[in-house]
Amino acid sequence: MKFYSRFIALLGMLVAVSAFAGIPDSPQQVQPPSVGTRAPIFAARTAQGTLRTFEPDSYKKPTVVLFYRGGWCPYCNAQLSDLHLVEPKLRKSGFEIVFLSTDRPELLYSSLKATDIHYTLLSDSHLEAAKAFHVVYHVDAATLAKMREYGVDLEATTGTKEHELPVPSVFIIDTSGTIRFVYSNPDYTIRLGADALWAAAQPLATVK
């Protein structure tokens, strides 16, 4: 029994080390899942701190899952404002829309410059969901210093000392839990626009 316990503990440590070692050092190295693969299990917290878990077999609606850097990011705010134009059409077509931010739960809404948000905003401050989708990378010291110059303290906004960010990415997952669309661009200034998202989503609409 003692040997078994030690084995399990060692296995857990190896998994943890492997997961850490597998995180790229640049956004260009991330490898998100491909179209046609099963969506990973992931969880994130609401602004109230409630944990929501998403499993491949539990999707009642086709779902848009979007990873963004945080409310402090002007490009993220611009994207959320742009997608606001297509959000009513997506909902009427039967979609759920889930946005995942690195901000702590209590900062989810207060940090945003965009207003009148009707998306489901969830906190992925430890980037566990981003890791599940393989879109997370380590932020180097030079970038961290530049962010601080602009008044962005990543440790304060995430509540961690991991210094990680997601590559801004969009996934569309159907009701079977299969990924049907992927957009992931290592250049955080280039985002998927509302028209492109709507075009990608239409084939999966459950309400015509």
Q: What residues fall within each predicted segment?
A:
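Short active-site neighborhood of thiol/selenol oxidoreductases, capturing the structured segment around
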Residues: 55-83
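A short, polar/charged loop-to-alpha-helix boundary motif
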Residues: 188-203
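Bacterial N-terminal signal peptides that target proteins for export
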Residues: 1-9
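N-terminal "domain-start" segment that seeds a small globular fold
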Residues: 23-55
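Short loop/turn microsegments at loop-to-beta-strand junctions
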Residues: 39-40, 62, 167-169
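Structural microenvironment flanking redox-active thiols in thiol-disulfide oxidoreductases
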Residues: 78-134
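Thiol/selenol-based redox catalytic cores and closely related redox-interacting motifs
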Residues: 124-189
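Bacterial N-terminal signal peptides
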Residues: 8-18
